[in-house]
């Protein structure tokens, strides 16, 4: 409360592996109710429609659907369904286009700019995670972020962009 800085309480896949989404939703909402600070209660990297629906139904204020391993058509289809349900409850939706890799794991594939434009225009999401050289769980001090690609995507879309990792 002292700083007034908004906070995101996030439940990623490793957290959800140990604690069910309904319990996390109640816990996060309780914590948020104990402060005047703006708190976002976020399901991060929901990989299925049902997982995101469960987050919506469990009191989260934001969900992220990670359809980055799906075809563009399937990613749009599922993201649109999630956004339709979420928006009825004033819940924001983040989608991901272009796989973001992991440190010492599968490398980032990079977001295709035209796919990003199509995804932003057709999925009805509120924010879009992109792959531009960023890496989850990065431990090195040097990142190879493609700022030119970020600028090109930003110029062609009217949606807030999100970078995971790095």
Model-derived features with residue positions:
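Alpha/beta enzyme core
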Residues: 1-15, 21-40, 46-163
